[in-house]
Every structure is written in structure tokens, then in C-alpha cells.
Amino acid sequence: MSAEPFEVTITEAEIADLRTRLRRTRWPEREPVDDWSQGLPLAYAQELCRSWAEDYDFGFAERLNVFPQYRDTIDGLGIHFLHVRSPEPDAFPLVLTHGWPGSVLEFLEVLGPLTDPRAHGGDPADAFHVVAPSLPGYGWSDKPSTTGWGITRTARAWDTLMVSLGYERYGAQGGDWGSAVSAALGEVAPERVVGVHLNLGSVAAGTFDDPTPAELANLEAEKEMQRTGRGYSAIQATRPQTLGYGLTDSPAGQAAWIAEKFWAWTDNDGHPEDALSRQTILDEISVYWFTASATSSARLYWESFANFRAKVTAPSGLSVYPRDITRPSRREADLRFTDLRWFEELPHGGHFAALEQPESLVQQVRGFFRLFR
């Protein structure tokens, strides 16, 4: 293995092509409802795409290139990753893993506080050396050309990467698919992974004889998610290739497919831009568009969706945000996590903790890993 420095580049020709496609979008009719119950409303889809074509700042590549990035071949696949070393000599190694529809961009606001707490008003004893890879088929990692790249194989690749960087003892953190990969990492490399911190504890609602009001609410939320919120995952887990033809060719389609999740999964007051700026939303959508990764990213659902809630035996920490997809109670979490050493319920935030509540997530990660330093 030999990591090579890497920078993200977006050409003017690529931007011009995107703008042309957006301006030529053939729109469907308006939805016959006055809410989001049928998906992204036409008016917002049109406004979002107008903004993307006319006044969006395409500088996400430059913001990402501020941090050291590399590519290396692991298990036959080119993997893109950020590797930000702390100025503190005793910093603790940590691998951060994003999910869908996220990317390594979501970590830009937490990299500084995690790697250099002294410069951000924190305790230098909490410093981390951070490695943040792009999942296979996501961002600037290669797209697998064969099956088999599920969460376990990805976890093994992450362990190989960490060892190649000289880290024989490290922690793992993630949300969404990052939570599944981080949990799997604790299982495949228990001799090196001291603990895993997750900001998505995907746990089946418990069936207790004495459920609390919060547990009953979680059960109802689970039922509602199954009824109205699983369409995207059913498609991605069964027909990712078919879906990809539309999303890879139509930026409006790609934007709508992702933006709807920033409404459904964030702590907002009815509109995604209550929780995230339009710039942030379009940054994340742009990663998928410019890397043409709609299809390859969806294949992770085909590979591993049935294994998302596998038992976790590694020392674990769970931070529960109130508008996340699942919000287990402590005893519900104990049904999946057999060595749960940190459990906190936060007052604000949703599925995208690093984007919505970066300061909160940093504090949670610092607190959990103090147990292992």
C-alpha cells in the first residue's frame, strides 16, 4: 500500500454541463397535496435547482482541499480519505465514517475541533488524529465492479487502512451507514478498536411489559417510518441499477432524491433549510452529481441493508438526537449493544449530527473516548 496525495477538482466544463441540464429540466405537474406527503414539492424542487444553476457557490472542492487527502488501493479498490493529524503528540487515532446521502464533506466543521481542541477552546488532552474515508462507491473512492462490498468488507478495509497509517489502537465513529461500518469494525478488529461511538443507534423498538411514553413514541415512529419513509431504501436495496439511470442523467432528479431526506431526517420546523443552509444541501447533492455515484452508493443497500442492526459486542457509545430516524431508549439500546458504556439523549438535532449539531457531536465524541485514553 502506498497512499498518494489527492485533491478534488471540478472543471468549468462539468459545471457548464450541470447548468445546461438544470435549465432544460422537464418538470412534472405540481403535487395534488399541500404538504410533503408525496415527496419533494414542485415549488421547492424548482427553486433549489434554479439556485444550483444560477447562484450556487461551487467552492466545496476548495473547502475540502484545505485538508490533507489521499487515495490508496485496499483490497483491490481505490479508497479516498482525509487524514488530518493533530498537532498534539498524544492524540488518539479515530476513523470517521459517513453515510447516505452524506459524504466526507459533512465532517468539515468537526475536523478542526477534533484534531486541534486547543485552538478551539478545548482541552488538548481530547485531541484526535482523524481519518475520514469515502465509502466504496461514494465520493472519490472507486466504484466496486463486483459484488461483496458490504459493511463487513468495508470495515476490514478500514482496519487495513488504519494499520497502514501506523495506528494499531484506535476508535471508530459514524452515523447512518457509518454507524454500521463502525460497529462492524469493532467486531472484525477487536484487538485494535478500543470503542465505537455512534450517532445512529438503529435498534428495533422494544416490546416491554411496561413501556415508557418515550418507548411508545419510538414504536410509533418506527411504524410510521415503515409506512411512509422506507420507499427510498426498498428501491435502493432491490433495484439500485434501475434507479441510477434517472439520477445519474438528471441533476433535478438527483437533487430531489437527496433533498427530500434533508427535510425528513433533520430537526426542522417544516422545511429543510430550517436545519441546514441551502449551500450545505447543494454541497452534498453536488458530491453525488459530480462523482456520478447515485447508482454505486445505492448498491450498499443491496449489499447490506438486511445486516444494518447486527449485534454489537465492542465497547460502545450512543448519542441519540431527537429527530433521528430511530431514537431508542437505554434499555432498547441494550438489546443490540452488549457493552454500552455511553448513552446520552440530546435536546436538538437529527440524522445529520455533524452538519446540524457539530459542537454537540464533538462533545459527545470527546466524552466517550475519554473512557479509553
Question: What would you call each of these model-derived segments?
Answer:
Residues M1-A16, R21-L22, R26, V194-S286:
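Alpha/beta-hydrolase
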Residues E14-S86, D90, T280, W289, ...:
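Non-catalytic accessory segments flanking enzyme active sites
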Residues F58-F60, G122, D126, L135-W149, ...:
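Glycine-rich "HGGG/HGxG" loop immediately N-terminal to the catalytic nucleophile
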Residues T152-Y170:
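Conserved acidic catalytic loop of the alpha/beta-hydrolase fold
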Residues Q236-R373:
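C-terminal subdomain of alpha/beta-hydrolase-fold enzymes, centered on the catalytic histidine
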